[in-house]
């Protein structure tokens, strides 16, 4: 129990802005998905999709940003390659759950293309995070 409080305190003290950014990104992603599924003010989501180039581009962009932000939050505890995999795995799981739930919504359709777009966003973010983690480890070794 003490470990959880210690990690929470570390995130609060060292990565508060990153945690807020991740929370806002996650909340806006869930809200956009819910708005499209319910049909309630879905035109705002469609306008956002058009602004970024389409539905698949939005999937890639959000998965990319969520993975980067989550790694930034989680790297306060350990900045190695394991956290890259944890962040990528959690975002991938959430993307799969969201796309799977669309199969049960009458206003939405399940799309493998959307899953692949999300996986591409996660993979690119994991590559960036891996480069950053490697750079941090080399910097620590040299000091």
Predicted feature descriptions by range:
Residues 40-46, 95-123:
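Interfacial helix-loop-helix junctions of multi-pass membrane proteins
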Residues 1-73:
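"…centered on the first transmembrane helix and the immediately adjacent amphipathic helix/loop
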Residues 61-77, 85, 120-136:
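Membrane-interfacial alpha-helical segments at the cytosolic side of multi-pass membrane proteins
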Residues 76-89, 143:
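Internal alpha-helical transmembrane segments of multi-pass membrane proteins
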Residues 3-4, 137-143:
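Short, charged juxtamembrane terminal tails flanking transmembrane helices
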């Amino acid at each position: 129990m003490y470990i959880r409080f210690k990690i929470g305190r570390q995130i609060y003290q060292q990565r508060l802005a990153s945690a807020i950014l991740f929370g806002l990104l996650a909340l806006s992603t869930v809200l956009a998905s819910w708005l499209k599924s319910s049909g309630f003010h879905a035109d705002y989501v469609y306008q956002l999709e058009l602004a970024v180039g389409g539905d698949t581009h939005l999937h890639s962009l959000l998965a990319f940003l969520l993975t980067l932000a989550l790694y930034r939050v989680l790297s306060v505890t350990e900045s190695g390659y394991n956290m890259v995999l944890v962040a990528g795995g959690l975002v991938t799981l959430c993307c799969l759950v969201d796309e799977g739930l669309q199969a049960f919504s009458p206003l939405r359709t399940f799309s493998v293309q959307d899953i692949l777009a999300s996986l591409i966003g996660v993979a690119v973010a994991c590559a960036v995070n891996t480069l950053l983690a490697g750079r941090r480890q080399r910097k620590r070794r040299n000091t």
